[in-house]
């Protein structure tokens, strides 16, 4: 059994990565406000977790203006997709071994 990813394993970050993964390939990115609603957290908490994921290279954050309003878009990077997939496989191994 391979080890899990300590960065992704934290509950809020796991929800973020799951939400981003679920959006693929339908949407290239998720708006910060929508992601906050999906994850069920505050602006500050989401921002801190996004920073951790971005530093790990798991997500890309794009800040831009739309209709003169700031907009933050978040997308999963290829490295993030691989890390999330590996972590899901790790969790499945744990669950499968518990069912035996």
Predicted regions located by residue number:
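Canonical helix-turn-helix DNA-binding module
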Residues: 33-63, 68-69
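Basic, amphipathic "hinge/linker" alpha-helix immediately C-terminal to the N-terminal HTH DNA-binding motif
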Residues: 66-85
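Structural motif
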Residues: 11-14, 56, 71
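N-terminal helix-turn-helix DNA-binding core of bacterial DNA-binding proteins
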Residues: 4-42
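Conserved beta-strand segments that form the floor/walls of ligand-binding pockets within enzyme
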Residues: 15, 60, 75
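Amphipathic alpha-helical dimerization/coiled-coil segments
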Residues: 3, 21-22, 82-100
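Histidine-centered active-site/metal-ligand motif
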Residues: 9, 49, 87
